[in-house]
Curated annotation (Swiss-Prot):
GO terms for cellular component: intracellular membrane-bounded organelle; nucleoplasm. SUPFAM superfamilies: ARM repeat, P-loop containing nucleoside triphosphate hydrolases. ATP binds at D1291, D1292, M1293, G1294, L1295, G1296, K1297, T1298. The modification Phosphoserine is found at S91, S95. This is TATA-binding protein-associated factor 172. PROSITE patterns: HELICASE_ATP_BIND_1, HELICASE_CTER. Regulates transcription in association with TATA binding protein (TBP). Removes TBP from the TATA box in an ATP-dependent manner. Residues 1636-1790 form the Helicase C-terminal domain. Residues 77-97, 219-247 are annotated as: Disordered. Residues 85-97 have a biased composition (Polar residues). Pfam families: DUF3535, Helicase_C, SNF2-rel_dom. GO terms for biological process: negative regulation of chromatin binding; negative regulation of DNA-templated transcription.
Amino acid sequence: MAVSRLDRLFILLDTGTTPVTRKAAAQQLGEVVKLHPHELNNLLSKVLIYLRSANWDTRIAAGQAVEAIVKNVPEWNPVPRTRQEPTSESSMEDSPTTERLNFDRFDICRLLQHGASLLGSAGAEFEVQDEKSGEVDPKERIARQRKLLQKKLGLNMGEAIGMSTEELFNDEDLDYTPTSASFVNKQPTLQAAELIDSEFRAGMSNRQKNKAKRMAKLFAKQRSRDAVETNEKSNDSTDGEPEEKRRKIANVVINQSANDSKVLIDNIPDSSSLIEETNEWPLESFCEELCNDLFNPSWEVRHGAGTGLREILKAHGKSGGKMGDSTLEEMIQQHQEWLEDLVIRLLCVFALDRFGDFVSDEVVAPVRETCAQTLGVVLKHMNETGVHKTVDVLLKLLTQEQWEVRHGGLLGIKYALAVRQDVINTLLPKVLTRIIEGLQDLDDDVRAVAAASLVPVVESLVYLQTQKVPFIINTLWDALLELDDLTASTNSIMTLLSSLLTYPQVQQCSIQQSLTVLVPRVWPFLHHTISSVRRAALETLFTLLSTQDQNSSSWLIPILPDMLRHIFQFCVLESSQEILDLIHKVWMELLSKASVQYVVAAACPWMGAWLCLMMQPSHLPIDLNMLLEVKARAKEKTGGKVRQGQSQNKEVLQEYIAGADTIMEDPATRDFVVMRARMMAAKLLGALCCCICDPGVNVVTQEIKPAESLGQLLLFHLNSKSALQRISVALVICEWAALQKECKAVTLAVQPRLLDILSEHLYYDEIAVPFTRMQNECKQLISSLADVHIEVGNRVNNNVLTIDQASDLVTTVFNEATSSFDLNPQVLQQLDSKRQQVQMTVTETNQEWQVLQLRVHTFAACAVVSLQQLPEKLNPIIKPLMETIKKEENTLVQNYAAQCIAKLLQQCTTRTPCPNSKIIKNLCSSLCVDPYLTPCVTCPVPTQSGQENSKGSTSEKDGMHHTVTKHRGIITLYRHQKAAFAITSRRGPTPKAVKAQIADLPAGSSGNILVELDEAQKPYLVQRRGAEFALTTIVKHFGGEMAVKLPHLWDAMVGPLRNTIDINNFDGKSLLDKGDSPAQELVNSLQVFETAAASMDSELHPLLVQHLPHLYMCLQYPSTAVRHMAARCVGVMSKIATMETMNIFLEKVLPWLGAIDDSVKQEGAIEALACVMEQLDVGIVPYIVLLVVPVLGRMSDQTDSVRFMATQCFATLIRLMPLEAGIPDPPNMSAELIQLKAKERHFLEQLLDGKKLENYKIPVPINAELRKYQQDGVNWLAFLNKYKLHGILCDDMGLGKTLQSICILAGDHCHRAQEYARSKLAECMPLPSLVVCPPTLTGHWVDEVGKFCSREYLNPLHYTGPPTERIRLQHQVKRHNLIVASYDVVRNDIDFFRNIKFNYCILDEGHVIKNGKTKLSKAVKQLTANYRIILSGTPIQNNVLELWSLFDFLMPGFLGTERQFAARYGKPILASRDARSSSREQEAGVLAMDALHRQVLPFLLRRMKEDVLQDLPPKIIQDYYCTLSPLQVQLYEDFAKSRAKCDVDETVSSATLSEETEKPKLKATGHVFQALQYLRKLCNHPALVLTPQHPEFKTTAEKLAVQNSSLHDIQHAPKLSALKQLLLDCGLGNGSTSESGTESVVAQHRILIFCQLKSMLDIVEHDLLKPHLPSVTYLRLDGSIPPGQRHSIVSRFNNDPSIDVLLLTTHVGGLGLNLTGADTVVFVEHDWNPMRDLQAMDRAHRIGQKRVVNVYRLITRGTLEEKIMGLQKFKMNIANTVISQENSSLQSMGTDQLLDLFTLDKDGKAEKADTSTSGKASMKSILENLSDLWDQEQYDSEYSLENFMHSLK
């Protein structure tokens, strides 16, 4: 059954997989109110259910829905009554002053004394609900309680993981003694709502009494309905919902009243309880409901109520409580009283709520926090007196003993201060004392809120309460002493302290000596486990330092050594880039504020230790003696709460460089973060070296100057044999030299040594272990050879082998030695095995050494270049730098070398001889080394790797549709398809997302970029990436002087372009004759151009623009590779010089698309457009209008490559089209283009907005009056015709798709005939059209054409019959202009049909070709037609891939190849639905869905019956449950024990295990299908399975014979009994008589009976109708009836009302037929595919039906059938979400409209989930049984004060 669009939006609120999806659904609900204001209360009543949901996401989404809805409700501002006007009766009744709560009667202390606490819940969910509990045996009751309690606590999974839960609680714990009512009444607490009503209200007004009466009337019916709603809504979150509850709501009634066209589906709450009174604010009743919910025992309901009220008041805070027919003064008073009433309710929540979430490091009280935000919104609109009264009550809460009450009070004050800054002068003095007490509270969560409450009013605090600030500052400093890793208030206190210290006044009032004592209190937080605390600590230090000048920093001197040590070791241990940058900022500020002498004195003793820390090996823990330990004072707790683990002693954790949390990362990632930490440490020490080398501290009279000491220290480490020591010192020298131009003492000490290092080849200490292992293994190998009398000792060094000698040993020496001896094969095998082991060790050792050697030489070279004292010979410097560019896998090292090369080139510009040209040439060669990026002219795309070839020819053909040759093809298209092939071919789970701390890697790279690459590609990628880093760095370094100072680079970019291309006389043939060499040179030049241009200084952009004509000429170069590179360069140019590039492109290049005689031009132009679109992304939007139509024209191009590329471009443009509206014309656009743009925009408006379509006047008479929506459909089809487009008309079944198609067919044939008669042009020549449909409908189509249109205009040929008949008909085709044939006939005669060019090809029920791999689909796609139209009421039946096949017929390539489609849409969508998916993957899935919907939107037209047919009677669907007969039960149970069932279990299990890697075997799947078929047949009738071959047949037959029964008695088939009763109830078969007493000729009801199987129809006919209901007349329509005769049966049934019943199979009778003669539909069986059942029932429920249609579905209870119905509902959600009513009005598609397609990836998972609890449970299933709250990030987002304040603006 169809779910309405509105219901789907609500379903998304609850089940949307991402917050983005839920928010989009919420926004669309707001749009509904905008268009249908009268639906306000209906919508709000539905939203209320979701505000009460147990699911956090659902409540937040419901709050967003409330926000979206109320934003579209006009502000309530009734016209005030003047004092002279008489008041209405209703307002006379009211007494506003008495009906509201007010402060005068409110006593918060009394409430605290007598009110019951509001906890997480009332505990009702843990009670056993059993009306007969008194009669049950106590043991049974306890057993049931135990089971229920285990389930609720998530302990029912214990046994599955081998954990016993029996002893957690015993029977005595569960037994209870009923408590007498009198005892309960003596309890001193009352429910909050009761207490408020009884104690604080003065009485009820007349209006309230009247309202109470109305509510009482509604209460009875609402109570039962609420129960049902609650059960229904909790199904998702409650696993153990009893089956009986679900069945209560199984009967679904679709009701449609005469004056309302909306369809009501499922249980919709009665909105009458929320109907507003005429003089009331429209939202009054809804707010009252929410106010009542504030005191619900369940925290989730309270939270939802607070959320709803907050959103309403943001938009309508000025309207609450106002009554119409009141004076202005009365309205103001009513408003303030209403606000006061609400404030008091919120204060009661603060007082009584005790629920808090302790999941994270800080308590989050969702109810109190949300109510505090709501209070903030209320106070915004309250008068000043009310604000002060509110604050007075909040202050009373701060005096209470319970920490939760104080916490709530401070939350209220926090938002009050933030919102009412206008009265801060009076508010702040009132509350400040209490807040300061809060800062000293024993409870750390209270302290956290107290600190947070002052952050937004820091400025006011400093200026208004200056005298209190010193005390607050001291309090905060003292609080730092009490904080530790587990305290909650750390972040808030650090933030407040940092905020206060930014004000000079605060600095002045701080005593200098005190900072010396206070600042060290920050040290522990530099090493805090939570990054936000570390950040806050650094920001506090930076604030302290930046607000001081050097003269007033005396407090810094005593603590300077410790501060330097803490910050440096913090740097070494940190892994976050953001925090590392902040460390550098604080360090530099510290060095600038402290005197140089003091810095040198403090730092020099520790310089050596710091260098050692920086040199720490990455795999070894740091010696804790080298770290300055931080001792935080232990916090003594005397009250409040203690978190788990707070009292435990902390373990001493091992520390590693770059953080212990990264130690388990993969080697590439770990190497990246460690190198980043070393480089940052080098920056800090480099800055420190500047201080040490300062002339002021290096006085001549000193014995030992600091600079000289530094030089000696650095030299000591450079003389070490450790690679890490050398690398670290070289890095420090680089950073120091970058900051300070010259320091002779250090330079003289280290420069010679650095030059020596560049020529040294050492075996470093770091490879000692593998080197020693290599020596030992080599000696063992030599010894093993000696054992078999092979002496090799004389050929190798007997002492220590070098790596080269070891390598020779295991290759040349070993092979020569063994080959000269005749060894036993077994001995030789053993020796070779040892050799391979040694060879592996040698290779590993060599690789480690090579990496270290290269890095040592590279950083030494960088140091020499940084010192700016280059030696005479530059080769030792240049060589390692270039090698790093070519070979280094760590991007940080490559980047460092790239920066050094840029500096080297700068220093060498004036040098003779100058090495720059050689360096540039080498870099350009390296840049072009990757054939995947820089194509080779002779072979433009690299040959397929063996891996792809191994996939087999079929998959390769499927994935790589486009072939590229030397002269033809589009490389961009090839790469898109190859990428899609790679993505869809990848097996296994999606790779994990890169963690946050390594996410900030250089663009285009990551720490683990080489993990998934083919080993053969890896060197190319590394070398190309290094060259790219180097060239972009060089270009940025030289800026605007690049062309002058580096003429060789400029020439490499544009030289071949100028020399090869003559823009005035371009001759492709002569270029071809010159051979491949100039073309390859041009390709390489363009690669350099692309790389360098993107980073070039804007001063050089005009020079680049001068070469645009050359680039455009290259787009028609005969070489594919040149065209490709030129297209990429045009793309880059469009990004850096958009206006100039696009103007020339539109004027010169875009017209080439129409050059159908020159495919080279077309390929170049379309590839360039693709590259421009890729580079500009949304920047292309201003030009879209001018691009769409030319691209559209190429979507049917004869050249495959052009067609595929054009469809891809068009698909992208279509998605961006909605953004085009309102974008101004780009500057400097020519007048011609602006004029053309206006013309093309008209087309776009029609494409995107169906309402702007031109009305199409059908030029031929049609014998029917078209309804408006049918005329709209014809207009749409005519629009497609005009622009040579194709589409899917997917109107709901029964809306006249056939008629609309006939109209456009007849109209276009007439138009073509007239045009041809006038012009005689070949393109207007009359052509026949083809309609392909299911065989049942061919006759129907011919009749419909004859009925609606004269043969003069459409002359159909019914092409059917056996082959000989069809051959005869083929000769008649020329005499007809319309051929109607079935799909099978077209498939069989495709050789005939493919040779005819058709005008229209219409596929009726076109979803038949949903599987593109069937012979039928392949045949249909061979048809040639000007226009292709698909008619289908259900274009998507199971999954989204079906849509690809339909569009592959309409517009091949529009959605890419099947693999591209799967890569772009299928893979992300599937990944986003995986339980393990990251938030990034979920977002990608949502965006993919949005992109797909947007892309296909203009080519789908969808209207639903309930939207367009006001006169169609309702359709009522009812499920009719039957219970299995004893015989069926026996057979069902026998099957459950059978071998067949075991086979199925094994198959499903193996399929589950293999689903990540491969699909289950076909044969195994067949077992499952057979088993399912068996059970389905058994549910229908035992005779269908109990055949003579059945093992139980004989026994059963004998048993029945004894009982005088047979297998065909209807008592054994409850469905037949139920069907008989239904027929009798409909007045059939019981000899029904008319009112006159005579037997009625025509029955009151006529019935369609649908079965799946022909054999079941036989049973219905022979076992039920003939023996039991002989008077029932019936016809039959199934597969046994020849297609040619089926139409006559349909006509006879429709035209002869005396035929009571039509028996049909769903497959034959469920498509396209018009059976409006029936008004009742019975499904004896159900289809796996819900669309088929839907189509079947709509045979009767369609245009022409005058009576209510009743649909009965016979379902056997508790069997497979119930699961089939559940599966149907799931698939319906898929189809309705993709192809929705939005397609009826294209303008309704906003950028935030998303689709939520899949919740499962294939059918079997639903059942699989149910069976997964047997045996050992997976961790996933255990976790799913436990409920939890949102994580901390989500809380931060929801309760961010900054976000909240922004939302009030």
